[in-house]
Structures are given as structure tokens and as C-alpha cells.
């Protein structure tokens, strides 16, 4: 592989930690991640929770792993699965300060290529002593027009439904891997820090759901160690680790990384919590999140979660942060004041949308735009999301999005598609200005998909402020339907290079297509 060797020793800086799972042997990405946990030879470091890649662009990517002891992370990259002629990137030393996790930043990669990578952990005192390698793969974004495909979803291990080995664990990741996506857009709630688990749960039909349970999953997370344990728990799952080794991730957070429906400055009175200050909890959760996800965001400098990831001339992905700057949950009828995104993020989104040359602009919004999402945690009729349900002119948080949509129309920002999860069912919404109370925008689509492995709910009411019309939905027959009953969903987006048509397919737990919508770009 002809990488620019002046770039080769620019390793990553970020590290982090967790519970030991075991060595994943070398070989293909899927085989490596699926190998049963086992110890390497005595005295050598071992990779405990597999490998992940993330935030992949045409020339850059980040690779994540975790060690069982302090060690130096090294990453080799090659076009060849046998790693002949591979180039090596020197990563960080993984220490207890970051729970022994770490990221290596890969730069100078070739565009539009499928690349194989493998991670080894080098002993800090004995030269040449390393762990067994763990392999993964990624596809860099193309420089020229090329087919692009990705999947999205959210909500993993929610409502007490965790890893059930009897049902294949988080088997939706097998279905997602089967469509061979270039990357996975995680719409948040990758962990449920406020969701303790029990070993068994009685199902309505008389069966018993059996959870794998770790110590950190027996109570709500409050300490940094407990928040770290939420991420380690999900990485105990074989299908999830295999998927991570095969498919890079674009990650954004939602509420359950901290606790349900939280907002900055909140002081809670909820069962199980001794720490009442949400800002304290959020800071701990944020640190664990950065330690355990393959993002390029650097927590040490207060890195922004909102960012744009370009994946070739056909696609830009705008990752929103609808948590960090969020105003308090109220009845949301304010005519002035802050909203969900904050002034800095709104200005960034407008600027980047206007500057984007990509055919398609994916807006990754972890909260739906047109669905009414109640928040009853304070015993009041408060609202958690954007829509406030009166079908009238924009009020409360709707005002920010009216501003963004109006700006996009004024500056001819075409071909925006909004993707979300959060509400635990799947749906397709068309936003029609002819049916809207606020009509100063171009029509667009929003697609909802999830959960990955959590209780299924819905459907939620649609708000008419932006003319949302329901085109498809599938929701469970009752609230908190377990994954054993189905109603787990993901979405797939495929962009055809020749026609530039973007096709969205909503799929179920087994990958069955439920609804397909091709979209032709507006010129």
C-alpha cells in the first residue's frame, strides 16, 4: 500500500477502559470478532473488547480498542487481508486514566478503498512483546462519484432488555452487516445508563427473557466507573463486536447515555440516584462516551459532538448534538429564548449546509422533528423533543428549526434528508409546506428507525407545524414490547452513483424490507 510515509507515525492521543472480555484472534474481521474470549500467553497484553473504526472520510479514520493492562496501541493498515507490505501507525499508551481504552488516528489513507487494519498492543517494558492481533476493515470515502450505502438506528439495551444469549444476543447487527454498508450511523442511546437489568424477565406469553448481567448493570450509572461499565456491557455481545470490526461508525449521543430526558442544569429527584445534579452525571457520561466510541472528537479539549462528515461527492452527514445545549423541558410554548441546538450550533449548521457541495445532505437528528415526545419525568405535561403538538405557528423549540428550514430554502440548499431514532418504532414522514402552519421551506423527508435491542413503543402523534404527513409506520401492539416479540428496526440508505437517486429502506430485526422510498435529487 502506497501511503504517504511522512504521515505514518502520526498516531492518536486518546485513551479509555473497562471489563475484560478476551482475545479476539486474527483472521477475517468477522471471524476475529466472533472468536470466543481467551487469554493470550502469560505476560502479554490482550485486547478485551474488540476493535472499532469511526468517522471515516476519504483520507482519515480513527481506530479504537481496549487493553487489559497498560500498553502501546499500534495499528497496521493494508489493502491486502494478509497485511503484506502494511503500514504502521503508532498510537497512544493505554492507561487506567482512560480505562485502558484508546484511539489511533489514521491519516494519509487512499480514497475510495476497502482497507484492512489490525491492532496489536505492545509491552511498555519488553521490546517486541505484543498481544495477538485483532483485525477489522473499513472503506474510505470516494473522491469521485461512487455508490454509497449505510445503515442507521439507535437504542441498545433499553428498558431492561439486554444481551440474551438464548436468542442470539444483539442479532440485529447480523442483519445490518448482511446488507454490507459502508458505515453505521448510530442515532444515540448506544447505552442505557439509567436502565438496570435483572437476570430474568417474565414475558407476557409465559416465556422467560434471560439477560447477561454485569455489576455495572445492576443499578443506575452515577460514577465514572459505572458509566464506563455501560459501554463495556454492550461490547460483551458477539454480534455487536463482529459488526464493529466490519462496519465503521458515525456516532452521536441521545439522552440515555446520561439518563432519560435530561437537560443541562437539571436537578433530579429520581429513584436510585444519590447524585442529583445532572451536570455532574453528564460530565462523567460524556467522558465515558468519548473513551468508548470511535469518534474523532477529543474530550480533553471539550470537543464538540456536532460535526460534518463528508463521504464523497454524493454525501455529507451533519451530526447534530441535541443534548449539550438543550433548554429545560417545559410545555414548549415560548415565543423567545433558547432551544435545543444553541446559537453556535445553529450558525454552524447553516454555514455548513450552504457550503456543502454534496448532492445529498443527511441531517442526523437524535430527536425527531415532527413527532410529539412527552416528558413525564417531573409529573408535568412537559415535552422532550422539537414538536409541541398544537399544529400551529412555530413556538418553543420549533422556532430554531423554522429558522434553519427557512434559511435552507432562501439559499437553495437542496436534498436534505433527516434521519432519527429515539421513539422505538419505524416510520416515514413527508414534510409538505402546502399542509404546514409554517410553510417557508422546501419539502423534505424524515425517516425514523429503531430500536436496536430495547423495548418497542409508539406510535407518537405527528405535529402539523411543518406539515408532517405519515407515509409509513410499524409499531408494536403494546408498550415495551420485548425484542423476543420483534419490532426492532434499522434503516438503510443507498445512493446510486449513476442516477444519484437516494433510496431509503426501513428493515426489521431480520433485515426484511418493510418500506422503500427512492428519492430523486432536486437540481
Segment roles from a protein language model:
Residues 2-23, 32-523:
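Metal-dependent phosphoester/phosphodiester hydrolase catalytic core
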Amino acid at each position: 500500500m502506497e501511503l504517504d510515509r511522512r504521515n505514518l507515525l502520526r498516531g492518536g492521543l486518546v485513551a479509555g477502559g473497562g471489563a475484560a472480555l478476551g482475545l479476539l484472534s486474527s483472521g477475517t474481521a468477522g471471524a476475529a470478532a466472533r472468536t470466543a474470549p481467551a487469554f493470550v500467553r502469560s505476560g502479554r497484553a490482550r485486547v478485551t473488547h474488540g476493535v472499532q473504526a469511526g468517522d471515516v472520510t476519504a483520507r482519515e479514520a480513527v481506530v479504537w480498542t481496549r487493553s487489559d493492562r497498560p500498553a502501546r496501541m499500534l495499528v497496521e493498515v493494508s489493502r491486502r487481508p494478509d497485511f503484506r507490505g502494511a503500514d504502521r501507525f503508532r498510537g497512544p499508551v493505554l492507561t487506567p486514566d482512560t480505562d485502558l481504552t484508546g484511539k489511533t488516528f489514521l491519516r494519509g489513507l487512499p480514497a475510495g478503498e476497502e482497507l484492512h487494519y489490525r491492532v496489536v498492543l505492545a509491552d511498555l517494558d519488553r521490546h517486541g512483546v505484543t498481544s495477538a492481533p485483532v483485525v477489522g476493515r473499513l472503506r474510505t470515502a470516494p473522491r469521485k462519484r461512487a455508490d454509497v450505502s449505510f445503515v442507521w438506528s439507535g437504542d441498545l439495551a433499553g428498558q431492561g432488555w439486554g444481551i440474551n444469549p438464548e436468542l442470539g444476543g444483539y442479532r440485529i447487527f447480523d442483519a445490518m452487516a448482511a446488507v454490507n454498508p459502508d458505515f453505521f450511523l448510530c442515532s444515540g442511546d448506544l447505552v442505557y445508563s439509567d436502565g438496570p437489568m435483572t437476570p430474568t424477565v417474565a414475558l407476557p406469553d409465559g416465556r422467560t427473557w434471560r439477560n447477561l448481567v454485569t455489576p455495572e448493570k445492576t443499578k443506575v450509572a452515577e460514577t465514572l466507573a459505572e458509566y464506563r461499565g455501560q459501554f463495556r456491557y454492550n461490547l460483551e455481545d458477539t454480534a455487536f463486536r463482529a459488526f464493529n470490526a466490519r462496519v465503521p461508525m458515525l456516532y452521536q449521543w441521545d439522552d440515555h447515555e446520561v439518563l432519560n430526558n435530561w437537560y443541562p442544569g437539571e436537578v433530579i429527584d429520581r429513584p436510585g440516584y444519590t447524585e442529583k445534579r445532572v451536570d455532574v452525571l453528564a460530565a462523567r457520561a460524556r467522558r465515558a462516551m468519548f473513551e468508548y466510541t470511535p469518534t474523532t472528537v477529543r474530550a480533553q479539549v471539550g470537543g464538540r459532538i456536532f460535526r460534518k462528515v463528508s463521504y464523497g461527492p454524493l454525501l455529507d452527514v451533519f451530526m447534530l448534538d441535541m443534548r449539550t445545549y438543550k433548554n429545560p423541558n417545559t410545555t414548549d410554548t415560548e415565543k423567545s429564548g433558547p432551544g435545543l441546538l444553541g446559537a453556535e450550533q445553529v450558525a454552524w449548521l447553516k454555514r455548513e449546509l450552504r457550503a456543502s457541495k454534496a448532492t445529498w445532505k443527511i441531517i442526523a437528528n437524535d430527536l425527531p422533528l415532527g413527532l410529539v415526545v412527552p416528558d413525564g419525568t417531573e409529573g408535568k405535561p412537559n415535552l422532550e423533543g422539537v414538536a409541541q403538538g398544537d399544529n400551529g405557528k412555530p413556538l418553543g423549540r420549533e422556532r430554531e428549526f423554522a429558522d434553519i428550514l427557512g434559511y435552507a430554502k432562501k439559499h437553495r440548499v437542496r436534498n436534505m434528508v433527516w434521519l432519527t431514532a429515539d421513539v422505538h418504532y419505524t416510520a416515514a414522514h413527508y414534510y409538505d409546506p402546502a399542509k404546514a402552519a409554517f410553510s417557508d421551506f422546501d419539502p423534505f423527508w424524515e425517516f425514523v428507525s429503531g430500536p436496536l435491542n430495547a423495548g418497542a413503543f409508539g406510535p407518537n402523534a405527528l405535529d402539523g407545524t411543518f406539515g408532517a404527513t405519515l407515509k409509513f409506520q410499524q409499531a408494536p401492539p403494546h408498550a415495551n414490547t420485548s425484542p423476543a416479540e420483534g419490532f426492532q428496526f434499522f434503516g438503510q440508505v443507498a445512493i446510486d452513483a449513476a442516477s444519484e437517486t437516494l433510496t431509503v429502506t426501513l428493515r426489521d430485526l431480520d433485515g426484511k424490507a418493510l418500506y422503500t422510498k427512492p428519492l430523486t435529487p432536486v437540481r
